[in-house]
């Protein structure tokens, strides 16, 4: 099935010094995952939990709190998605020791899942 946007794209709103009051970026506006990895909806659902927690602390400064916590959430699935892309030799990017380890681990996990 072809997808309209089949790439990984991350925006770092947590690094902004200012953000308009009353607005909040959420879901794919923070991070768009390649749909083949099936991570986008899961991350958006957990972002909803984070948003609820941030709203509980009051509306003042919510964007900064939310973006910081959402960024920490996104870090791991982002590393997995980008690392998975780097398994393909034609994809350009640095294949660090961490990326190679994550790819090795996920390959082992998939092989084990096929036998279980």
Where are these regions (language model features)?
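C-terminal helical "tail/cap" subdomain of flavin- and related membrane-associated enzymes
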Residues: 50-116
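FAD/FMN-dependent oxidoreductases across multiple families
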Residues: 1-50, 54-73
